[in-house]
């Protein structure tokens, strides 16, 4: 396919699972991921494509490092920004397909010159989380470098709306569906709660392209998305998440569409699927037809993997009968590894032999993986060396010098008896732990809960919290989950009547657990946003030796969630939520705390004497300073809206007294509201001079968005849609 296409051809560079930031702390492999991503972006510029389509997992970590974010932004800015005009005409309503502070396509922004737009969905590694439900793609979108689409706000009610693009006579409907937990999306498709929208004009002329990020194969009965669940009006599906490169499109005979699996651009696990040569694809769409040009990636580190069985391999025949055969077995295994290293180096040279640009490039160390099954007949034995020690023999020759070899025994039908006082692991978990290459946190949790039942804590949120703790490095995920679940159970039990309590609490606890489980599976229950409160740093604490004080577990005093409604005089009054700049709510909460505290504190003779002594002591002082001493803390709090609400409440409670009546907060000095009005008015005046809407571009002022409607599907189709709304335009 020529690099320059005709006026009716849309050229798209397709790539998935870049995993920028993978092994960035490894002294040898630290730069592999971003170098390959930079090569992909350079190919987009040199091949003169119209756009780049990324299928999720751009970053390896949910919270990418500054280095990873810097390298991605540098590569995007270097290769995707420029004066070359983008020939793609955007026909959708941007508010329907984009979210965030700038809900429009970046190459229509009058302040940014984008020559190659990048469209991306998120995967399971870079998915939204935390306060604000943001992800790394939101940062790239707000910087104008990426068009982040395919969000799934409700996992149990998914609406997939396309981005409508046109170049010449070719019309492209680009659908995106970001990653959802596989069991949940499988159930959502099964329950017919996924609706695809189609253009209302010239429906049959559009090339329908879908990109998603899910399990492609049945790892578990419901832990994947079947191709047959997708609607048959699609023309091509770009399948992310699977790392094996199967980039040649394959047609599904039942649905009629083609499926392309580009695979990852870097090996993140030492398995056979990662050893397939890595490619990216340039997809050329003309009308309703398409062509694929696959391009091998040159910066990928060569990877060779083998698996041998010592009992059947001719090179080890008879060694199991000899005593002290460890040295001989190690020697022959080293010869096999040397052959694999030579094979990997030859692969790299053959890929670069016709390239003049890479003559001065140093050949990288290869990735080598040798899986050895060393079980032997009864009465014989293969003695193998420690895998760490064996791998270190190849330091300076391989990139993975700590895990070159993996020894394992053949699984037998005999079961081991657990020692007294120790519980045996379930069979599935034991097998997963033995095969370290295929171990998965989700699989371990599911297998464990299949053998062990929970009485109070809900199972699905528990598994999600463990996954957040391990995969997303959220140190407080499990703690927050347990606190939320227990507090919900306690609140539910306190609301029970005496008759229900006498019947027994076990059934009610089980009912509450099922409700929490159901709410989580439907996406209604999320982990509460919490504000951490830290203790004061001890004197003499050395951050260089002991680390930052705020990162220590003993530094956290409490994790306070959003305040629950408090009762006042038999009436339920919701506690005020303190937000930055919300001064009225700040004082309202202080007043509310004072009232409730005063009511709860019992009045005794001792307290009355203390109050009288306090008033007598106060009377001896000057009256003006005494009044200011009460109002001063309020003034400081008003000036600093970022102060922790918990500290404010403690200060108010300490100063509270039974006989003291605080001044109502509504009698605040009038100049402060006046200043607030002025500060609010200034931004409005400035904002009228700046308009970042799509209509500012002169060439698009007369353009109208094409309406899209949900797909018309027959009654016996598995994707029956809800009735279309007549008054709403898409």
UniProtKB/Swiss-Prot annotation:
Keywords: Chromosome, DNA damage, DNA repair, Endonuclease, Exonuclease, Hydrolase, Manganese, Meiosis, Metal-binding, Nuclease, Nucleus, Telomere. Residues 685-704 have a biased composition (Polar residues). Residues 581-591, 645-659, 708-719 have a biased composition (Acidic residues). One of its GO terms (biological process) is double-strand break repair via nonhomologous end joining. Its EC number is 3.1.-.-. GO terms for cellular component: chromosome, telomeric region; Mre11 complex; site of double-strand break. Its cofactor is Mn(2+). Mn(2+) 2 binds at residues 57, 124, 213, 241. Transmembrane segments: none annotated. Residues 595-633 have a biased composition (Low complexity). It is an enzyme of class 3 (hydrolase). The active site is at residue 125. Residues 662-672 have a biased composition (Pro residues). Belongs to the MRE11/RAD32 family. This is Double-strand break repair protein MRE11. The gene is MRE11.
